[in-house]
């Protein structure tokens, strides 16, 4: 008999849905289909796309496209620009879930390396929505100094090292308004896996040592870590097999099953999983999920994960062939069954922008 459990509305605040000029990697229908197959109600899309979401016109283009194609609820980030787009904030802030600032190398050309420009964006973002940052190593300390000065609610994405966990633990003890996210690939894999996976285990931040991985699990236990986020970032097999493979791996359909596997192994409680993928992101973004929203999971379902059967367009995963325990059987949004355990039932356009201007 299945061991079924009902989970509340899940939120992934860190995804790259691709679409638009990158629709060959994934489009807003295929990747939100991956979201509902992974149990999610809501996903928040990053701005490093083509065109990059750095101005009101590009933002409206993306809003229109996601609105027409999404099968789950959604939001999009506006991107901070190295060329200084702070003058646009008044025009876009009401339509987005937050501001994204890239402070280390990543996919796309959105890196802000100039400390003065980073500070200008911190000073200008006064809209009560989180400022989310890609910061690694010593850059984490630099961003914390801006948090300390401007007191902006700041979310640190995909933290991957023991050093960073230490900095952020101290910052939390200081009372700074920060939250911390980690990704499943950093929790389950190390640099040894990248050597075997090659480019299919290549992402930013990259995989780290076993000691770093263990520090992330320690951060979950100590509550330095608030959120587990997928950093879903699909690319085609051909791109990953090229001479210059891009960063990123898909993750929307493996995040919850991996966490449920940790529950089965006694590494996490189910309540802690719910905090990491539902309660904490809802609290940070001030979200009240609609009635009739959540997913049903079979906690005892044991199976070999087959990436060829996934909803994401790229049809591969660094976790392909891994034995998992815990499977999404149904996902509901606003009382509607959007995923039945095998097929996506919602039609493109069903998903709503939770941050739509009212």
Residue ranges of each PLM-predicted region?
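Divalent metal-coordination and catalytic microenvironments
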Residues: 14, 35, 39, 74, ...
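Histidine/acidic residue-rich metal-binding segments in metalloenzymes
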Residues: 87-228
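Divalent metal-binding segments
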Residues: 16-26, 44-57, 78-87, 105-110, ...
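His/Asp/Glu-enriched, well-ordered alpha-helical/loop segment
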Residues: 138-141, 146-151, 221-228, 233-297
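A glycine-rich helix N-cap at a beta->alpha junction
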Residues: 64-80
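Metal-associated gating/positioning segment near the N- to mid-region
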Residues: 4-69
């Amino acid at each position: 008999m299945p061991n079924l459990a009902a989970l509340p509305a899940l939120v992934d605040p860190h995804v790259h849905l691709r679409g638009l000029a990158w629709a060959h990697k994934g489009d807003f229908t295929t990747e939100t289909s991956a979201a509902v197959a992974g149990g999610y109600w809501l996903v928040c899309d990053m701005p490093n796309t083509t065109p990059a979401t750095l101005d009101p016109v590009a933002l409206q283009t993306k809003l229109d496209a996601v609105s027409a194609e999404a099968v789950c609820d959604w939001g999009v980030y506006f991107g901070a620009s190295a060329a200084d787009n702070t003058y646009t904030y008044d025009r876009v802030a009401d339509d987005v879930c937050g501001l994204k600032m890239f402070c280390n190398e990543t996919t796309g050309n959105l890196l802000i390396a100039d400390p003065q420009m980073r500070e200008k964006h911190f000073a200008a973002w006064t809209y009560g929505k989180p400022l989310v940052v890609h910061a690694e190593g010593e850059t984490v300390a630099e961003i914390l100094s801006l948090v300390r000065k401007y007191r902006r609610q700041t979310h640190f994405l995909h933290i991957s090292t023991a050093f960073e966990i230490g900095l952020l633990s101290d910052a939390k003890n200081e009372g700074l308004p920060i939250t911390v996210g980690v990704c499943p690939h950093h929790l389950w894999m190390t640099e040894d896996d990248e050597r075997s996976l090659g480019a299919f285990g290549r992402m930013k931040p990259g995989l780290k040592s076993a000691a770093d991985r263990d520090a992330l699990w320690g951060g979950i236990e100590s509550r330095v870590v608030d959120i587990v986020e997928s950093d879903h970032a699909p690319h085609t097999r051909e791109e990953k097999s090229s001479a210059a493979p891009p960063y990123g791996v898909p993750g929307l359909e493996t995040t919850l099953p991996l966490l449920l596997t940790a529950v089965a192994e006694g590494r996490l409680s189910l309540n802690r999983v719910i905090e990491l993928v539902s309660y904490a992101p809802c609290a940070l973004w001030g979200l009240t999920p609609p009635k009739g929203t959540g997913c049903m999971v079979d906690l005892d379902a044991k199976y070999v994960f087959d990436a060829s059967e996934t909803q994401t367009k790229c049809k591969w995963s660094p976790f392909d062939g891994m034995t998992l325990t815990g499977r999404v059987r149904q996902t509901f949004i606003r009382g509607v069954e959007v995923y039945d355990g095998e097929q996506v039932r919602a039609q493109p356009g069903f998903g709503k922008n939770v941050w739509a201007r009212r």
